[in-house]
């Protein structure tokens, strides 16, 4: 490989008019075998260069050949000034971080930070570790938003241009992936090696849940309500559970395994409530229209729980026909979306979803009450957060 590099370099110069020679040091990155015995080898069979060994090579240069400085820039010298190296690292860090820093400037409700603080009432994790957990969950959440917006072709995020429409899809996805890797690196600082496999398994579950959601959309497959809930438990619930998992691994509280299991169930239930509520609000809330666009989920082809119920109860197949036009047109018109909402209302799907959310909210509150009894500690912070998410009727 190194000999081929040298050969390629030689072709850049006019050897026929060479009048001087330049000696450079080639630093080898991989072991390769000489065709001839190296000077310091006693073997007649040929030797080898070990990793990072050096070999001095004479290169003929013409009168008009590039200067030695140019040659050194062609990766034949690993020497680099500390100033140049610092500038390069600073620039690459700025470029890699820019899309992520952009999404951090967008308005946020701070739900996940408040959620972690509320769980910590019971788990008593030290402040330093709690800060890392908040940062990690924020990194995973925001990087997933960057990816989601690109996958869904969403032009807006929280009322501002989506990250991929500002930096381009390639740069946005590269940064999102980069941030996920950085998050996992930070997780390694606060959990032991034995627990790391379980933690990364939870992160993997998030992507698997998202994969199912995307697959249904791409192939126009209408999932059952049970399948939808399983997907939500993976896609959204897993990130909520990851918060609990990281807190539990760093907890200084005396909390029983049964209490942790009950807390995990409550957290999964809250994750389901959160996703169903978010999808429902996308259909009926004017604030969501300002932030994301009018019924944007319908443009994306996403199967929300409300839409699944409406399709199951639509004997006229009107919804099926309208949704098929999205695949033809690329998106639905405002009038088509209004017709979808009309069918949902007529079929009782909007009311059904609203009632279901009310029941889920009641169950979450009941789980909190049960945990307060078992832990002998009230959790006003978690109660306040759940009340904040309560659907206004």
Swiss-Prot record:
Geranylgeranyl pyrophosphate synthase; part of the gene cluster that mediates the biosynthesis of gibberellins (GAs), diterpenoids that may provide a selective advantage during infection of the preferred host plant, rice. Gibberellins (GAs) are diterpenoids and are synthesized via the mevalonate pathway. Biosynthesis of the major metabolite GA3 (gibberellic acid) from geranylgeranyl diphosphate (GGPP) requires 13 steps. Dimethylallyl diphosphate binds at residues 157, 235-236, 275, 282, 292, 302. Belongs to the FPP/GGPP synthase family. GO terms for molecular function: (2E,6E)-farnesyl diphosphate synthase activity; dimethylallyltranstransferase activity; geranylgeranyl diphosphate synthase activity; metal ion binding. Isopentenyl diphosphate binds at residues 109, 112, 141, 158. The keyword Endoplasmic reticulum does not apply. Its EC number is 2.5.1.-, 2.5.1.1, 2.5.1.29, 2.5.1.10. It comes from the Eukaryota. InterPro entries: Isoprenoid_synthase_dom_sf (IPR008949), Polyprenyl_synt (IPR000092), Polyprenyl_synt_CS (IPR033749). This is Geranylgeranyl pyrophosphate synthase 2. Gene3D superfamilies: Farnesyl Diphosphate Synthase. PANTHER family: GERANYLGERANYL PYROPHOSPHATE SYNTHASE.
